[in-house]
């Protein structure tokens, strides 16, 4: 998977693959290929999101102290 894709481009490609698979008229071999590509795109998006979360944690930290990112719903 090309890592030079932007997050938005990767999401768009992932949505396109999901749409093809949801139609249900895709030959099995092609469906497997789409699924593998979709998993790679999903991993790429996850990596990009984690990178942004790390950057935001640094940016939003008080007095230069790194504060961990807490997603909504993760608070205990």
UniProtKB/Swiss-Prot annotation:
Localization terms from the record: Cytoplasm
Record keyword Chaperone present: no
Any GO BP annotation: DNA catabolic process
Record keywords, A-Z: Cytoplasm, Exonuclease, Hydrolase, Nuclease
Family the UniProt entry places it in: Belongs to the XseB family.
Function recorded in the entry: Bidirectionally degrades single-stranded DNA into large acid-insoluble oligonucleotides, which are then degraded further into small acid-soluble oligonucleotides.
Protein's name according to its UniProt entry: Exodeoxyribonuclease 7 small subunit
Source organism of this protein record: Bacillus cereus (strain ATCC 10987 / NRS 248)
